């Protein structure tokens, strides 16, 4: 029994030696030749791919879309009969704040449209 084990071991070692010799030589050696496309021109480098930040935000948006789909599906016990919650009404303070901001913005635009031409005209007179 021990002899058969040794014979199998030596056969494996001889096989491994043959394989090592067979894979010792390089199968392919690249030659430095010009690469050309179908028209015979040297191809230009392709433009840069999408930036990492765009890929990150795309992945986040893609995953959040699937999360929303799963939440609205039967998997999260959602039913089609349930209406979405209504948006709470805007409080008076918030509404007045929005109106004040829009009025201030409009006033600044009017001042900008009136003052800049007057200053330019004054420089032309001097």
From Swiss-Prot:
Disruption phenotype: Negatively affects telomere maintenance producing very short telomeres. Enhances the toxicity of heterologously expressed alpha-synuclein. It comes from the Eukaryota. Almost completely overlaps YDL119C. Disruption phenotypes caused by deletion of this gene may also be a result of a defect in its overlapping gene. This is Putative uncharacterized protein YDL118W. It comes from Saccharomyces cerevisiae (strain ATCC 204508 / S288c) (Baker's yeast).
């Amino acid at each position: 029994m021990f002899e058969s084990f040794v014979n199998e071991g030596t056969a494996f070692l001889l096989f491994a030696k043959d394989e090592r010799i067979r894979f010792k030589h390089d199968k392919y050696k690249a030659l430095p030749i010009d690469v050309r496309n179908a028209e015979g021109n040297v191809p230009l480098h392709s433009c840069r791919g999408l930036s990492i930040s765009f890929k990150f935000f795309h992945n986040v948006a893609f995953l959040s879309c699937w999360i929303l789909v799963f939440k609205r599906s039967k998997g999260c016990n959602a039913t089609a009969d349930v209406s979405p919650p209504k948006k709470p009404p805007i409080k008076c303070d918030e509404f007045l704040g929005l109106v004040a901001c829009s009025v201030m913005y409009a006033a600044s635009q009017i001042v900008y449209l009136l003052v800049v031409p007057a200053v330019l005209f004054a420089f032309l007179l001097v």
